[in-house]
Amino acid sequence: MATQVATPLSPSYTSELIIVCHHVLQHSPTPLTPHSLSFTQGFLLGQLSIALLIFFFIKFFIFGEPPSADDRSLHLNSLRRARTLAHQQSIKQLRTRSNSISLSLRHKDSRSIIRKGEETRGGPSIATILAKTYYNVKGHQPESLDWFNVLIAQTIAQLRADARQDDAILGSLTEVLNSGSKPDWIGEIKVNEIALGDEFPIFSNCRVMPAEDGFWYGPGTTGTEEGRLQARMDVDLSDVITIGIETTLNLNWPKPLSAVLPVALAVSIVRFSGTLALSFIPSSSPPSTSTTTPNPEHHRSNSTTSSSTSPPHRPTTLAFTFLDDYRLDLSVRSLVGSRSRLQDVPKIAQLIESRVHAWFDERAVEPRFQQIVLPSLWPRKHNTRGGATEDVEASEADLDEEVILEEEEEEEEDGGYTLPVPPQLRHPSAASTSLEAEGAKLREAEIRAGVRKQERPGMSRAQTSREEGVRYRPKPVSRTSEGWSGQKGMPGALAPGTFR
């Protein structure tokens, strides 16, 4: 069997084959590596996810439909009720603890100046008050409060009329909003719209009942006092009370005022309904610390010690609060931007509404309440009014006293000769007051014309007349005049030396 021997390739053919292979390798497409393929897919996926996030944020967060007013009201009422119940439970625990402590430290008076009534401690009980006023809490029908609505409507109408006369209320609100601490990213706030409404609140369904725990239990109480009576009434207001403001949102990064975004807001109260609770909190005085020790130093030390340990005096106050089932409907209009503007953004309305509810809850919704200190109801002379003549005399009493004192000083400087003023002239009428005013105007005109010298401060009329060369001689006192001179006593009389 013959063997085949491979013939070797020629050098020229080998070189051509190498050139062809090199050319094929250069022009063939480069295959994609796994690393480059995964980077491209990740980049595209990231861009798509960012776009989806922006889309959902704008659609559901900014332009999403807010829940209905009924749903929001129910949710807020449930939250407030839970807070009220928790507060009442804590008040009961605190009262039980304070009662156990104060039983052994109760103060006992050595004697009583005013005879006590049926109750040996504190005021009358709720049952006694209701029995003596013939009021049955369970059987008494609620009152309509029509008379109270008329009085409140007159007061509100007068306040609205005073506010519409000038723009003082706009300036006051602008000053209040810009005062105090304000974030740096909020610019100057300007009030550009205000509407006080045309309707009036209607109070109805008034009933009297014992006050609940926590309503009258304030910082000045010890928890051992008896219960109080409270009056509850329904309040309903359907009106449009609007306040509109303009401001700017400032972007202070990376440098101050890098960007400024104009914002215009208008908040309107559309409806308010709730239950108002009123209660009187009587005054409380510290216990008496009088002793029979004749030593003043010992008495001073006892009074100092007792004043440091006794509770402070609490005046009589009127407390009011709203129950947690109230409803407050707001309407918020917004305009954000300068060129491309966003109008009535729902999320901005929700944020403002939540802030308004929180502000009101922190001040006048149970368990929190407002206290107004009542003035003394004891009849006083300076508070007495009535009758046209009496009103004029009361308003001019202070002025008359000053005029009488000035006349007495002038007479003393004139040589010590005093003239008694008749009692009927100590309180001049309105006509005499107008005559005195005309006389003062005439004297001012003479001073401006140069006929009369102006009185220097600290000099009386008598001294000024002496400088002018005029000398006055006191008139004798007769029996009929009884020391009264018509030159000085007549109302509206001109001063001596007026005409030369």
From Swiss-Prot:
Q: Name one GO cellular component term.
A: endoplasmic reticulum
Q: Which UniProt keywords apply?
A: Endoplasmic reticulum, Lipid transport, Lipid-binding, Membrane, Transmembrane, Transmembrane helix, Transport
Q: Where in the cell is it found?
A: Endoplasmic reticulum membrane
Mark out the compositionally biased spans (Basic and acidic residues): 438-471
Q: What residue intervals traverse the membrane?
A: 43-63
Report the domain of life of the source organism.
Eukaryota
**Compositional bias ranges of the Low complexity kind:** 283-294, 302-316
- Secretion signal span: none
In this chain, the stretch annotated as Disordered covers 283-316, 406-500
Q: Which CDD domains is this protein grouped with?
A: SMP_Mmm1 (cd21671)
Residues in the Cytoplasmic compartment per record: 64-500
Quote the PROSITE patterns the UniProt record gives: SMP
Is Endoplasmic reticulum given among the entry's keywords? yes
Topology in the lipid bilayer is annotated as: Single-pass type I membrane protein
Tell me which residues make up the SMP-LTD domain.
Answer: 141-375
> Do you know which InterPro entries this protein is assigned to?
Mmm1, MMM1_dom, SMP_LBD
- Quote the biased-composition stretches of kind Acidic residues, using this chain's numbering: 406-415
Segments on the Lumenal side according to the record's topology features? 1-42
Coiled-coil-forming residues are none
An annotated GO BP: mitochondrial genome maintenance
Q: Which family does it belong to?
A: Belongs to the MMM1 family.
Oligomeric state and interaction partners are given as: Homodimer. Component of the ER-mitochondria encounter structure (ERMES) or MDM complex, composed of MMM1, MDM10, MDM12 and MDM34. A MMM1 homodimer associates with one molecule of MDM12 on each side in a pairwise head-to-tail manner, and the SMP-LTD domains of MMM1 and MDM12 generate a continuous hydrophobic tunnel for phospholipid trafficking.
**Domain topic, free-text comment:** The SMP-LTD domain is a barrel-like domain that can bind various types of glycerophospholipids in its interior and mediate their transfer between two adjacent bilayers.
Q: What does this protein do?
A: Component of the ERMES/MDM complex, which serves as a molecular tether to connect the endoplasmic reticulum (ER) and mitochondria. Components of this complex are involved in the control of mitochondrial shape and protein biogenesis, and function in nonvesicular lipid trafficking between the ER and mitochondria. The MDM12-MMM1 subcomplex functions in the major beta-barrel assembly pathway that is responsible for biogenesis of all outer membrane beta-barrel proteins, and acts in a late step after the SAM complex.
Its protein name is Maintenance of mitochondrial morphology protein 1
Q: Which organism is it from?
A: Phaeosphaeria nodorum (strain SN15 / ATCC MYA-4574 / FGSC 10173)
